[in-house]
Amino acid sequence: MKWEPEIPRWKQVYAVMSERVVDGTYPPGERLPSAMAICDEFGISQVTAKRVLTELRQAGLAYMEPGIGTFASPLPEAPNS
Protein backbone atom coordinates (compact mmCIF):
# COMPACT_ATOMS: atom_id res chain seq x y z
CA MET A 1 0.00 0.00 0.00
CA LYS A 2 1.27 3.47 -0.85
CA TRP A 3 0.98 5.69 2.20
CA GLU A 4 -0.18 9.29 2.09
CA PRO A 5 2.19 11.02 4.55
CA GLU A 6 -0.32 13.68 5.64
CA ILE A 7 -3.05 11.15 6.56
CA PRO A 8 -2.65 8.96 9.68
CA ARG A 9 -2.04 5.33 8.74
CA TRP A 10 -4.96 4.06 10.81
CA LYS A 11 -7.29 6.24 8.70
CA GLN A 12 -5.83 4.90 5.47
CA VAL A 13 -6.17 1.28 6.58
CA TYR A 14 -9.65 2.03 7.96
CA ALA A 15 -10.66 3.36 4.52
CA VAL A 16 -9.54 0.11 2.86
CA MET A 17 -11.16 -2.14 5.47
CA SER A 18 -14.44 -0.21 5.55
CA GLU A 19 -14.63 -0.34 1.75
CA ARG A 20 -14.20 -4.11 1.91
CA VAL A 21 -17.16 -4.36 4.29
CA VAL A 22 -19.34 -2.03 2.21
CA ASP A 23 -18.50 -3.66 -1.15
CA GLY A 24 -19.14 -7.17 0.19
CA THR A 25 -15.55 -8.42 0.17
CA TYR A 26 -16.35 -9.19 3.81
CA PRO A 27 -20.05 -10.10 3.72
CA PRO A 28 -22.24 -9.66 6.82
CA GLY A 29 -21.31 -12.16 9.50
CA GLU A 30 -17.91 -12.97 8.03
CA ARG A 31 -15.00 -12.84 10.42
CA LEU A 32 -12.64 -9.96 9.70
CA PRO A 33 -8.88 -10.44 9.76
CA SER A 34 -7.32 -10.39 13.21
CA ALA A 35 -5.22 -7.44 14.34
CA MET A 36 -2.11 -9.52 13.65
CA ALA A 37 -3.29 -10.35 10.12
CA ILE A 38 -3.95 -6.65 9.49
CA CYS A 39 -0.44 -5.89 10.80
CA ASP A 40 1.03 -8.37 8.33
CA GLU A 41 -1.05 -7.20 5.36
CA PHE A 42 -0.45 -3.48 5.80
CA GLY A 43 2.88 -3.42 7.63
CA ILE A 44 1.49 -1.50 10.60
CA SER A 45 1.79 -1.92 14.36
CA GLN A 46 -0.64 -3.99 16.39
CA VAL A 47 -1.79 -0.82 18.20
CA THR A 48 -2.69 0.74 14.83
CA ALA A 49 -4.47 -2.43 13.66
CA LYS A 50 -6.51 -2.58 16.88
CA ARG A 51 -7.47 1.07 16.36
CA VAL A 52 -8.76 0.21 12.88
CA LEU A 53 -10.93 -2.61 14.28
CA THR A 54 -12.22 -0.33 17.05
CA GLU A 55 -13.12 2.39 14.54
CA LEU A 56 -14.94 -0.16 12.35
CA ARG A 57 -17.01 -1.23 15.36
CA GLN A 58 -17.75 2.36 16.36
CA ALA A 59 -18.89 3.12 12.80
CA GLY A 60 -21.31 0.18 12.92
CA LEU A 61 -19.44 -1.71 10.20
CA ALA A 62 -18.28 -4.50 12.51
CA TYR A 63 -19.15 -6.16 15.80
CA MET A 64 -17.08 -8.18 18.24
CA GLU A 65 -17.76 -11.61 19.66
CA PRO A 66 -15.52 -11.75 22.76
CA GLY A 67 -13.04 -14.59 22.53
CA ILE A 68 -13.97 -15.30 18.91
CA GLY A 69 -13.20 -12.26 16.76
CA THR A 70 -14.56 -9.26 14.92
CA PHE A 71 -17.21 -9.74 12.23
CA ALA A 72 -18.67 -7.64 9.41
CA SER A 73 -22.00 -6.10 10.38
CA PRO A 74 -25.09 -6.27 8.20
CA LEU A 75 -25.41 -2.97 6.37
CA PRO A 76 -28.66 -1.02 6.46
CA GLU A 77 -30.64 -1.29 3.26
CA ALA A 78 -30.69 1.77 1.04
CA PRO A 79 -34.06 3.54 1.00
CA ASN A 80 -36.11 3.11 -2.16
CA SER A 81 -35.99 6.17 -4.37
List the predicted regions and their residue ranges.
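Extreme N-terminal segment that seeds HTH/winged-HTH DNA-binding domains in transcriptional regulators
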Residues: M1-T54, Q58-Y63, I68, P74-S81
